[in-house]
Amino acid sequence: MKIYLGADHRGFYLKEDIKAWLAANAIEYIDCGNQVYDAEDDFPDFAKAVARSVLADSDSFGILACGSAQGVAMQANRFKGIRAAICREAEEVRETRSHNDANILCLAADNAPDFPALIQAFIATPALTDEKYQRRINKLDEE
């Protein structure tokens, strides 16, 4: 399993903290940017990069961060097959992973979430395979 990371300037330092935590826990990741703090960067660029990477690598997840998490979630969810979810509590993470098979976790840097607990829940929670959940997930990809 691999995790693709992305963040704009408001999420940059949270992303850097996440990278350190992932490395300390021997979890493979790829940083899709921004690589340096740039107060003028744009969140859609990094959300697109993470969404494309997750779609191309079926055994992966994404983590996106911006100030509120709203912008990166909106951008990522424009991609068919991406199910990006904004979560602030571990129970929300478990619910969206199990019921919705979320594949990108969106974090609000302005709220300084307890990101280790959220990431652990995201990684550890499998998607349920019940027909009703799969039916609903399939409907997300309809036009």
Where in the sequence are the language-model features?
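Mid-chain, well-packed structural core segment of small domains
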Residues: 64-109
